[in-house]
A protein has these predicted regions:
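Basic/polar N-terminal segments that are highly enriched at the extreme N-terminus
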Residues: 1-13, 29, 33, 62, ...
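Intrinsically disordered, low-structural-confidence terminal and linker regions
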Residues: 1-23, 45, 209
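Extended, regular secondary-structure scaffolds
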Residues: 2, 102-248
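Acidic/histidine-rich, surface-exposed loop or edge segments in extracytoplasmic proteins
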Residues: 5-15, 94-105
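Interaction-mediating elements
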Residues: 22, 26, 30, 68, ...
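Short amphipathic alpha-helical segments that mediate assembly, nucleic-acid/protein binding
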Residues: 23-24, 39, 114
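Short N-terminal secondary-structure initiator segments
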Residues: 31-51, 209-218
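Exposed beta-strand-loop-beta-strand "reactive/processing" segments of non-cytosolic proteins
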Residues: 37-91, 138-191
Length: 248
């Protein structure tokens, strides 16, 4: 017998349950009304109620539904003001209670940032010329990996701007393993606030590795024998119980 969490979990039954799909959607909708549809969300987490209230709820043997208000903390990037923010949303009352803009540091980087870096690089003339110098004319399938700047932010990036670094890998098509052909000595320093490459670090042309790194069976000289079947079962049923988000 398999124990599986339900595909969809509705409103919270316990005050410490993680935010449900409904609560996440509500928080996103409320913030988009305040900040616009182009706002970028980086993270969302439950703001736990006071411990005293949780103990009181549990000491009541959970005989009554969760009556405690549900609050979430959302970090993101306001594309209009071009600033990171931290917001508090009451998803029980359906209201944004606070939006605080970050003066030092940034909200966590996220997938929309990655997409923006790739677009900025591939449309930059300087980056395109650097790829041509390495024999790459068509950059459609070039793989670009954006990385956080860490403690090393290029001086051309203004203070307070959102930034990443990008390195490139050459692929023959979208199914190729780009990591077999790194473009060595070329790093793009990207200012995400102004959406441009502020410095292209180019240490000179290094020949691309000639061999591919594909994993598909048709590209291998031979294949190993497939492993024999393995089964892990509890024929008499599970020895644990799933109760909401608790495993007992």
């Amino acid at each position: 017998m398999a124990e599986q969490a339900p595909e969809f979990m509705g409103p919270s039954d316990h005050p410490l349950d993680p935010p449900s799909r409904e609560e996440i959607a509500a928080a996103g909708s409320l913030l988009k009304k305040r900040l616009g549809d182009e706002v970028i969300f980086a993270s969302l987490a439950l703001i736990e109620p006071p411990k005293r209230q949780v103990i009181e709820f549990e000491s009541n043997a959970q005989k009554t539904p969760n009556q405690l208000g549900r609050m979430v903390c959302v970090q993101g990037y306001d594309t209009v003001k071009k600033q990171s923010f931290v917001a508090t949303v009451d998803v029980t009352a359906n209201v944004v209670t606070e939006i605080r803009y970050i003066s030092e540091g940034q909200a966590p980087l996220n997938f929309p940032d990655v997409v923006r870096v790739i677009t900025i690089c591939k449309t930059d003339e300087g980056w395109q010329n650097a790829m041509r110098a390495r024999g790459v004319e068509d950059v459609t399938d070039v793989q670009i990996d954006p990385w956080p700047t860490g403690g090393y932010i290029h001086p051309n990036v203004p203070e307070g701007h959102r930034a990443m670094r990008a390195i490139s890998f050459v692929r023959e098509d979208k199914f190729d393993n780009g990591y077999a052909r790194p473009v060595q000595g070329l790093i793009a320093h990207v200012d995400l606030t102004d959406e441009k490459i502020v410095f292209l670090e180019d240490h000179g042309v290094v020949d691309l590795p000639p061999e591919h790194g594909r994993y598909q069976p048709e590209h291998q000289p031979s294949l190993r024998e497939a492993p024999r079947p393995i089964s892990i079962t509890q024929p008499e049923g599970t020895s644990f119980k799933v109760d909401g988000h608790a495993i007992k």
